[in-house]
């Protein structure tokens, strides 16, 4: 099983689609003028996101309200995440936060309708730490995700990794 698509209500699907194309590089598969736009990062799929227009006066979802917290997109390399970081800065898209999760680094921001988005890079499986290291009580930054965000005030090194135990003779 895998996730097929996410269907999101937005004020104006065409306007929101411009954001998703410019910032995330998504491709439009189909547009139903005034009603919906279907987008995908994968040209082999019809859509991964369906944006449905509900009108310019529709209220925004309040933080902490029941509903979708955020939608996460993955990139294949830390370099791709660096490119996205710069694209967001160049477009003056404010960051909610940038978090080192130990296994991954995520950049969190919002679309024009306030929907939460994350783009992240995850370490290859063979580099994952053991679970007891990820959930350890000591916060240690191992520097696994160096990048332009290092000095960004929105960057939080929340990694809960510890150095691997050294073998004793």
Residue ranges with predicted function:
Residues 50, 61, 128-131:
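A short, polar/proline- and glycine-enriched secondary-structure boundary/capping micro-motif
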